[in-house]
């Protein structure tokens, strides 16, 4: 029997760095550092895929040599597909982490600043109301004192 190591036949080809999976796209920011990080992650996943193809069939081929069942080749293809799916999930996970780690966009930072300013405005409004109430009470006390002094002056 001649066993050549070849990638499994799959209807879903593995993504290469230029062919990103659906939903994965470069960040909107033109930062070369972020693009390089994304390319590094994609290269890592591609390396995982490339590393599996020669190794897994070699192990499985030993089992095939011992057993003449045709189902072993199907097992090799199934293991390879499972690995490819895991590599894609890993890629998506790392891409999600990268999005979380990136700096917030201008719109996000402006929304955050607006929320902070609105909270500060509420606090200052409450302080102004409190001081206005205290000022009005002080005015009332001063008027009462003035009336009291006028009454005393009229008596004299």
UniProtKB/Swiss-Prot annotation:
Outcome of substituting residue 55 to S: Loss of oligomerization. Loss of oligomerization and dimerization
Region: Disordered, residue numbers: 1-38
A Pfam match: Med28
InterPro entries xref list: MED28 (IPR034456), Mediator_Med28 (IPR021640)
Gene Ontology terms: biological process: regulation of DNA-templated transcription; regulation of leaf senescence
Major location category of this protein: nucleus
Coiled-coil ranges from the UniProt annotation: 104-156
Localization per record: Nucleus
Keyword annotations: Coiled coil, Nucleus, Transcription, Transcription regulation
Assigned GO CC terms: mediator complex
Subunit details: Dimers. Component of the Mediator complex. Interacts with GEBPL.
General function of this protein: Component of the Mediator complex, a coactivator involved in the regulated transcription of nearly all RNA polymerase II-dependent genes. Mediator functions as a bridge to convey information from gene-specific regulatory proteins to the basal RNA polymerase II transcription machinery. The Mediator complex, having a compact conformation in its free form, is recruited to promoters by direct interactions with regulatory proteins and serves for the assembly of a functional pre-initiation complex with RNA polymerase II and the general transcription factors.
Similarity comment: family membership: Belongs to the Mediator complex subunit 28 family.
UniProt name for this protein: Mediator of RNA polymerase II transcription subunit 28
Species this chain originates from: Arabidopsis thaliana (Mouse-ear cress)
Gene of this entry: MED28
């Amino acid at each position: 029997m001649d066993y050549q190591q070849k990638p499994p036949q799959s209807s879903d080809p593995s993504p290469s760095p230029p062919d990103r999976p659906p939903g994965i796209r470069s960040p909107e920011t033109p930062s070369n550092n972020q693009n390089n990080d994304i390319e590094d992650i994609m290269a890592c996943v591609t390396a995982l895929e490339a590393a599996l193809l020669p190794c897994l069939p070699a192990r499985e081929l030993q089992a095939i040599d011992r057993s003449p069942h045709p189902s072993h080749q199907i097992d090799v293809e199934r293991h390879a597909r499972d690995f490819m799916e895991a590599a894609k999930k890993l890629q998506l996970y790392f891409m999600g982490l990268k999005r979380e780690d990136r700096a917030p966009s201008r719109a996000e930072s402006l929304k955050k600043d607006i929320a902070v300013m609105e909270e500060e405005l509420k606090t200052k409004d409450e302080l102004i109301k409190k001081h206005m109430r205290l000022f009005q009470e002080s005015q009332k006390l001063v008027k009462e004192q003035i009336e009291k002094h006028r009454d005393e002056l009229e008596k004299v």
